[in-house]
């Protein structure tokens, strides 16, 4: 019989997220979610760029996987700024399509991951992948709408201020109305800041809330705001520990992946010689595939040299190397995703125990609900015990003479 897991019910439990993130079911879900996200972005951008609504090319999303973390951040920021800054209606529409699609993907994937993490941490139970996906499917709309509730709140108060500004277009009367009602605009501004900032901080608790409680989007939002506001110091401590430990774990995983890629290229290159060097140089012109944050800058000679592959077999080799390294790098990012969901689930349970005094092992179980439903008659009345059944079925036998 294996040793039971040590659960301390304090910030040290966050260190368990590293091992929890390596659950094959979570890694599969994270990998599938990233693949679906990249595919969704490529398809949407390709479609709308063909319609001339946007000028962004779909290869930017593939490069985000290939490049290192610091390269990813700069490329992503520059790409988003180039798309968002003009505020063209078509570009805003495309961004909205992308966001809603990604939210639907990660509502399903994130819901399943946090469900597995909740049962793993709270009750040390291993739920099968099919059950986790079934739970995420049932609660999909709750997962989907919970992050949107703060956005809707900010948008509502923003629209109120816009309407007030439209009234200000009326000559004389409108200016007087805006002058007298401007304090309400300031209050709306404060509410937008409050709802937006606290909602962004508590966003990490919304999926774990639904996975642990089996509740809806409103309960997820209320708990997210309550936990951040009730224990801000504890919340910040947990998040700081989570961030530092997560970065350290991701650095280790990224270093192992980088070293694996470099050793594979180096040892195969010893045997293959100049051919593999040409393939590496050709690929390096497109992206620095072996870089995971631990490589030096590309030399000027490598940047200026132009390498072309003449034979189809070398091009095939280059393409397959790209596919293999893309898969490895995607696995690194999938670990980051599964770690994030696992750690946030642990933090949710810790804060729930401190604020609501709820036992950590208290998790919503569908089996209990099904048993309660099965124990209830079709009319909604509880089934009586066996002795009561006899009294109801044979009321006229009481006091009757026994048969001779």
Which residues does each predicted region cover?
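Helix-coil boundary and N-terminal low-complexity module in membrane systems
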Residues: 1-178, 191, 196-205, 210-247, ...
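Membrane-embedded alpha-helical segments of small multi-pass membrane proteins
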Residues: 179-184
């Amino acid at each position: 019989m294996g040793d039971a897991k040590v659960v301390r019910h304090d910030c040290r439990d966050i260190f368990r997220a590293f091992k929890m993130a390596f659950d094959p079911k979570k890694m599969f879900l994270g990998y599938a979610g990233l693949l679906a996200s990249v595919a969704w972005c490529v398809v949407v951008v390709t479609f709308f760029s063909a319609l001339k609504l946007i000028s962004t090319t779909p290869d930017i999303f593939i490069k985000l996987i290939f490049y290192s973390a610091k390269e990813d951040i700069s490329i992503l920021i520059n790409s988003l700024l180039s798309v968002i800054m003009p505020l063209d209606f078509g570009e805003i529409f495309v961004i909205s399509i992308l966001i809603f699609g990604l939210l639907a993907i990660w509502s399903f994937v994130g819901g399943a991951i946090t469900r597995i993490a909740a049962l793993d941490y709270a009750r040390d139970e291993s739920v099968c992948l099919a059950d986790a996906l079934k739970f995420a499917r049932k609660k999909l709309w709750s997962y989907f709408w919970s992050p949107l509730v703060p956005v809707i709140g900010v948008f509502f108060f923003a629209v109120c201020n816009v309407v007030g500004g439209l009234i200000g277009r009326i000559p004389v009367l409108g200016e007087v109305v805006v002058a007298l009602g401007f304090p309400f605009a300031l209050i709306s501004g404060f509410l937008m800041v409050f709802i937006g900032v606290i909602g962004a901080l508590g966003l990490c608790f919304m999926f774990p809330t639904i996975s642990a409680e089996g509740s809806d989007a409103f309960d997820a939002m209320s708990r997210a705001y309550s936990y951040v506001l009730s224990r801000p110091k504890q919340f910040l401590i947990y998040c700081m520990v989570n961030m530092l430990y997560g970065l350290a774990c991701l650095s280790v995983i990224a270093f192992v992946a980088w070293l694996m890629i470099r050793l594979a290229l180096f040892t195969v290159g010893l045997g293959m010689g100049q051919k593999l060097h040409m393939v590496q140089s050709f690929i390096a012109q497109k992206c620095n595939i072996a870089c995971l944050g631990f490589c030096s800058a590309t030399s000027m000679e490598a940047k200026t040299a132009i390498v072309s592959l003449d034979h189809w077999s070398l091009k095939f080799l280059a393409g397959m190397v790209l596919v293999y390294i893309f898969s490895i790098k995607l696995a690194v990012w999938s670990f980051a995703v599964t770690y994030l969901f696992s750690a946030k689930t642990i933090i949710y349970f810790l804060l729930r125990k401190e604020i609501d005094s709820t036992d950590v092992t208290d998790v919503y179980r569908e089996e209990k609900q099904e048993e309660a439903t099965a124990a209830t008659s079709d009319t909604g009345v509880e089934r009586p015990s066996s002795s009561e059944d006899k009294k109801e079925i044979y009321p006229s036998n009481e006091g009757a003479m026994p048969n001779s």
